[in-house]
Each structure stands twice: as C-alpha cells, then as structure tokens.
Design a protein with these regions (language model features):
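Surface-exposed acidic/polar loop and edge beta-strand patches at domain peripheries
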Residues: 1-183
Length: 183
C-alpha cells in the first residue's frame, strides 16, 4: 500500500511529498526532494516496528543536510580528484568543495546537486513502488550531455526493500555528448 502526505514546503513555496510504502508490519518512507529515503521501519525481535534509518524528523533537516542522509547523489557520488572529470579528450571542472585546501569535489555540487532538487514522481500501486526522476541539461552541474536520472523504491510482499538507480544520456539532438555517471 502506498500513502502520500505533504512533508513540508521548499523556500520557494513548492510542496514536498512523502510517500510511504507499507506491507506486513514494515514500511519505507521516501520523499520527492532529493529522491530521499526518510525511514525504514521493520519489526524487531518482539514484533514492534522500529525505524532503523538515521535521518531527520522534518524537511528543515534535509534542507541543511551536509551528510546527505538518505539522499540520492548524482551524477557523481563520492569524491572527484582535483575536481576534474576527464571525458572524451576534455577536462570538465566541478566545484572544489572537499579535501585538503578544498582541492577535490564531493558529490558533484553540494549546493545545487540532485539531492537538493524536487524530482518528478510516478507511483506503481500494483508493485508497491515509487519512481523518482530528474533531468539535467547539457552543461548543467558542469558536465556534458542531456541526462535523465531515475530511482525506484519498492517494498515487496515479504517486506524486502529494493532500490534501483539508473541514468541515461538523452539524445535530444544529433550531437549528443558523452556524460559520466557514478551513482
């Protein structure tokens, strides 16, 4: 079963929605801001449901979330040496925001990355799943290529949670460019 509730509002007034996938005493809550996992509640050995995920109780915590708890990080997760991405004979520069003297890059862009965006949502009631998707234009966040990112969260009948991520370069023109992805 999937339920949807307003989780809060962004500073620009757009609503953030929390989706809860439930089955047999377990539940997973996710939100469309950052395609973020909010909670994973599972029965303990006595059968009482408990949230086993580290996170925040309200949207404000996720708006200022330097550890990126629960968030989908893309297009590049983790560190990029010297904040440079060599691709197809060219060097692309990302914000230098991490490491000694802030010489490296962490998570593409901590201020404007996909974990700081409202994603589109598609519900799959029959599969007890929700898919979030987000698009980036060529050059956006410092990387080439028109790109679409998607993550699907599913809680099956046996209370097994799965997450699938994916990205693809979109061929919106004859000059589609290569693009990196590390999610």
């Amino acid at each position: 079963m999937i339920t949807a509730d307003i989780f809060g509002s962004l500073p620009d007034g757009r609503c953030v929605t929390k989706y809860t996938l439930s089955t047999h005493g377990a539940s997973v809550s996710v939100m469309d801001f950052g395609a973020t996992v909010l909670s994973v509640c599972v029965p303990d050995r006595t059968g009482a449901a408990a949230d086993v995920l580290l996170g925040f109780g309200d949207l404000a915590g996720y708006l200022d979330n330097p550890a990126c708890y629960g968030s989908t990080i893309a297009p590049v997760a983790n560190r990029t040496d010297r904040a440079e991405v060599p691709l197809a004979g060219r060097i692309y520069h990302l914000p230098a925001n991490d490491g000694p003297d802030h010489a490296n890059n962490l998570h593409t862009d901590l201020a404007r990355g996909l974990h700081k965006r409202l994603w589109s949502t598609e519900l799959f009631e029959d599969d007890n799943a929700v898919r979030f998707s987000c698009e980036l234009a060529d050059g956006e966040l410092g990387l080439p290529g028109n790109r679409r990112f998607a993550v699907t969260y599913r809680l099956d009948k046996e209370a097994q949670k799965t997450a699938r991520t994916g990205a693809c370069a979109l061929k919106w023109s004859m000059s589609a460019r290569p693009t990196p992805r590390l999610m």
